[in-house]
């Protein structure tokens, strides 16, 4: 059916026609955009078009695009949230933040004491010790929860986990060769913290739980899409998935349904196999794609987490004197992978948190492009939180884009000022203003489940640059406008995914992916962005309303 939707305001993100009040949809695409005065012409050209006024008092925008999230957001709600900040679950339940390690232990102990099978692994997530005045969780803390079953607590960054002695013994930590992935105390004894991807794998394999495999299940996908719909996201990424054989088929069976309310862009985890095999696997995935499911990106994680002290920082390194972080992929190996995938014609996204990692990754990209020139590669640095103006200038020259982790400004801004970076470097944390001024394509993200999936909140962070304590990080030159932030969560993200000819703006011929808002973000302004209610979404013109939020 062909339908014209009337709205109070339509913000198109199309510079040719930035504002409208009516949009016509036919065959899953946008047929026309304009005002009430255009309806007669549309009817004459296209035949009868029903006028729907359900959203006549609402604002329509291009469907929000989350350019850096993980399907783990849909899985972790099966486990136990123990983060510092309150968090809304997929069903709307607000889970209160826990303000001390003792509170976390007491909460998990209560769960353990009421479980049907207390021998099963107990998994929690969202924890971050950086908020607790120097105290870190130990294996002995988690032994208070239980010493008779595996207890693992994933940090919010998903780069570190804490474990009890049950897991420590099962992992044979005392005889482990790769000691750099195990945190030790001043006496050299393991504390119960496992660092990085390899360290976390050492711990989790003892639980017989494969979270990466479970993250691709139909149930996880449905939960993931539910969170996306609630926050206005119509296209979301899973930005690092090894995509084992058969996983792509299971994903497609779920995602292709009209009732599934989002598009999914899966980034293949490029270093999950040796370079030649990895390229071959990526090539094999190309004919498994569809309009709603893409395997178009390759992802590499080059360093760790700043607040977890596993990111690679340039001199003077960490403000509190902590040792520099980890290379998740050694620089020479990263160069080898990037060269192989550039030669094969695949866009690469690279996680670079620390500024040393950003610099090394730009070196590797430059070498790859010298060997295999590619005018529109759109390789993208993800997070890239400590990039300087010099880095942005170099990105512009190389044609590299960036997707900044703007939510860090709120959730960890105070800690970066006081502990990890110091005031000067924290002042240019996630410098969206500098990025745009230097001409680098910009997107911004949540990295869900690291922080909550909520593009309007992410936009609010980039515009206002306020920490959770209300401290402003940087000055006006690091901020962006409301309009620029809205562009970053629509067309900016679409560009970073090479999907800007299909989605990201409301213009003729593009997919009918729309976010329905209670209020107009431009009218509401900078401080009110995060509080705008999402009524629902459309994907391919199919309407998906949020319960309890009347159209």
Predicted segments — roles?
Residues 18, 74-77, 259, 295, ...:
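Short, solvent-exposed loop/turn segments at the edges of secondary structure
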Residues 546-551:
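Glycine- and charge-enriched low-complexity intrinsically disordered segments
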Residues 68, 399, 513:
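Active-site-proximal glycine-rich helix-loop-beta segment
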Residues 339-349, 356-379, 383-384, 389-393, ...:
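His/Asp/Glu-enriched, well-ordered alpha-helical/loop segment
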Residues 254-258, 283-290, 372-374, 395-399:
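Acidic (Asp/Glu)-rich catalytic clusters
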Residues 292-310, 400-410:
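Non-cysteine beta-strand/loop elements that form the S-adenosyl-L-methionine
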Residues 2-7, 11, 15-279, 300, ...:
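Divalent metal-binding segments
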């Amino acid at each position: 059916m062909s339908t014209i939707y009337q709205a109070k305001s339509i913000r198109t993100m199309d510079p040719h026609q930035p504002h409208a009040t009516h949009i016509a949809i036919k065959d899953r695409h946008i047929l026309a955009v304009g005002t009430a005065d255009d309806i007669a012409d549309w009817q004459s050209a296209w035949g009868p078009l029903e006028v729907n006024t359900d959203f006549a008092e609402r604002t329509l925008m291009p469907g929000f695009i989350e350019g850096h999230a993980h399907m783990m957001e849909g899985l972790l709600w099966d486990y136990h949230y123990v983060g510092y900040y309150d968090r809304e679950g997929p069903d709307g339940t607000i889970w209160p933040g826990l303000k001390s390690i003792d509170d976390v232990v007491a909460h998990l102990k209560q769960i353990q004491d009421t479980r049907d099978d207390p021998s099963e692994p107990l998994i929690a997530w969202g924890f971050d010790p950086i908020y607790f005045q120097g105290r870190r969780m130990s294996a002995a803390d988690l032994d208070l929860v239980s010493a008779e079953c595996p207890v693992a607590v994933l940090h919010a960054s998903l780069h570190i986990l804490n474990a009890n002695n049950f897991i420590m013994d099962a992992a044979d930590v005392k005889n482990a060769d790769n000691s750099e992935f195990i945190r030790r105390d001043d006496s050299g004894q393991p504390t119960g913290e496992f660092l990085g991807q390899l360290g976390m794998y050492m711990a989790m394999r003892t639980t017989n739980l494969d979270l990466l495999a479970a993250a691709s299940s139909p149930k996880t996908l449905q939960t993931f899409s539910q969170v996306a719909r609630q926050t206005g996201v119509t296209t979301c990424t899973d930005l690092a998935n090894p995509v084992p054989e058969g996983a792509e088929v299971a994903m497609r069976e779920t995602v292709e349904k009209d009732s599934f309310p989002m598009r999914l862009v899966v980034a293949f985890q490029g270093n999950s196999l040796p370079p030649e095999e990895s390229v071959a696997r990526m090539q094999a995935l190309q004919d498994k794609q569809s309009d709603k499911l893409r395997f178009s990106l390759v992802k590499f994680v080059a360093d760790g987490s700043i607040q977890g002290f596993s990111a690679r920082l340039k001199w003077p390194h960490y403000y509190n004197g902590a040792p520099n972080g980890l290379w998740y992929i050694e620089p020479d190996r990263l160069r080898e992978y990037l060269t192989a995938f550039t030669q094969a014609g695949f866009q690469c996204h690279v996680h670079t948190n620390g500024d040393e990692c950003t610099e090394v990754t730009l070196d590797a990209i430059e070498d790859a492009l010298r060997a295999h020139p590619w005018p529109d590669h759109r390789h993208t640095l993800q997070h890239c939180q400590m990039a300087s103006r010099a880095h942005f200038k170099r990105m512009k020259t190389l044609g590299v884009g960036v997707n900044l982790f703007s939510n860090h400004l709120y959730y960890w801004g105070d800690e970066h000022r006081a502990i990890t970076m110091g005031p000067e470097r924290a002042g240019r944390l996630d410098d969206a203003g500098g990025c745009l001024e230097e001409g680098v394509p910009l997107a911004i993200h949540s990295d869900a489940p690291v922080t909550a999936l909520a593009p309007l909140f992410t936009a609010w962070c980039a515009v206002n640059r306020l920490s959770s304590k209300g401290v402003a990080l940087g000055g006006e030159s690091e901020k962006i406008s409301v309009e620029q932030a809205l562009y970053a969560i629509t067309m900016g993200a679409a560009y970073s995914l090479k999907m800007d000819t299909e989605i990201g703006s409301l213009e003729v011929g593009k997919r009918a992916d729309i976010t329905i808002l209670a209020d107009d973000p431009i009218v509401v302004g900078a401080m009110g962005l995060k509080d705008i209610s999402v009524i629902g979404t459309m994907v391919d013109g199919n309407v998906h309303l949020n319960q309890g939020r009347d159209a």
